[in-house]
Amino acid sequence: MKPTLKDVAKLAGVNFTLVSKYLNHSSQARMTPETRARIDSALKELNYRPSASARTLRSGKSRTIGLVCGDLTNAYSAHFANLILNFLREHGYQLLIAVRGSEADCAALDFLIDRDVDGLILSGADLPENYFPKLPTAVYDTSVNRGSVMNPDLGRSLDAALAAVNGRIAGLFFRNSAWNGAFQLAAHRRGLDAEARILPFDLETRATELRKVCQEKPEWILTSGWQTLLMLQDLLGDEFPGYHPHLLVHANCRGPFMNALEIAGVIHSNTGDMVRELCTMLLGQIENSGSVPESRLFPTVFRPAGSPEFEALKTRHFQLT
């Protein structure tokens, strides 16, 4: 059985209250150095660990952050979670992860909230309709203005990316993504024939939606995410060998797939920089209860195919930034 405070007190030969004050570093705990040494020895001998839930009840803080993310077998999801984990650990917090289902729902959020996390990190796509947690929350890539928001700064990079477009273009994005509205605004500014398509999380259903796009044969396709790009490239090679659209992609990585001739350019961003800003915003809310949620933009830049910066993204091995 797990040792209790009473077990520690009995072994140390002191009362229960004194052990509790010792553990809580109470200023009212008056005891001799010998008594402190006996309590410390008993704690070590019994390998006593304070109850996290009891500590949370006393302090009102669990020092734990909840993250809703995609399947951790996905390289980007694992990389993103690991960056957050490392940042939080450096600041005295732990990370609790809930993996979303095929579509956004409340289950993952409720799981984390029920475990008394101090705050939440989630993507805009993970926000169910008419639902928002009543605790500090940082949301990234979202068109929904709730909580502290971290969005890509897309104005200039999208204008630069769409400058070369001379035909119909389809934009492929996830639900609630900031990319959707930014893409449509940029396309409107340039007078382009553009359509935004919402992609599902589920890979099989996503492949079906990508297949529909290929059947419609837009001259240009812009997609937010390298995983969707790889799926699209496979479809083009296997099922639509005669269809060769120009591809624009948002990527936070380098890799051999950048060698594909159909890629006309990349809107590039750095996930590590974004995570630091996102976590800093959230911890600011948690540690300063009077602070209000804020919105920030993280930089993106367009790298046209053939430029030195684009060529630098063509690495032999896949690397996430």
Q: What would you call each of these model-derived segments?
A:
Residues 67-160, 211-220:
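Alpha-helical recognition/docking segments in bacterial nutrient-uptake
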Residues 116-124, 169-175, 197, 216-228, ...:
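Periplasmic-binding protein-like
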Residues 156-197, 290-309:
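An alpha-beta-alpha
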Residues 1-60:
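N-terminal helix-turn-helix DNA-binding module of bacterial transcription factors
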Residues 211-321:
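Flexible loop/turn connectors
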Residues 143-172, 204-211, 229, 267-289:
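Hydrophobic alpha-helical segments within soluble ligand-binding/sensing domains
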Residues 16-20, 57-71, 167-175:
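Short beta-strand segments enriched in small/hydrophobic residues
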